């Protein structure tokens, strides 16, 4: 494993007609990823107030290997396949963390 954590922000726009189904699939994928993958340190999804179809996901992986492994998991591949027609826009942004803290 490499040493540097991978942190990225995913910015998505979802077809408003599919938002409830999309959210259910996103929750399922996040819960599986955090529970089953040691290298997935954190996945946090939020929507923009008054624009529930605009989603932001802060993703934190232990390292590049963990991120690459995540992309090949059955639960992630299922999520990508089942949501592909729901996502109207996707931007992935690599970010440098400044301060990230949480309580257990």
Name each model-derived stretch.
Residues 5-13, 42-71, 93:
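Short, well-ordered beta-strand segments in beta-rich or mixed alpha/beta enzyme
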Residues 28-41, 60-93:
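An amphipathic, aromatic/His-enriched active-site/gating alpha helix that lines ligand/cofactor pockets
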Residues 1-6, 44-53, 80-104:
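Glycine-rich beta-strand-turn "strand-cap" elements at beta-sheet edges
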Residues 2, 6-36, 41, 45:
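N-terminal first-folded block
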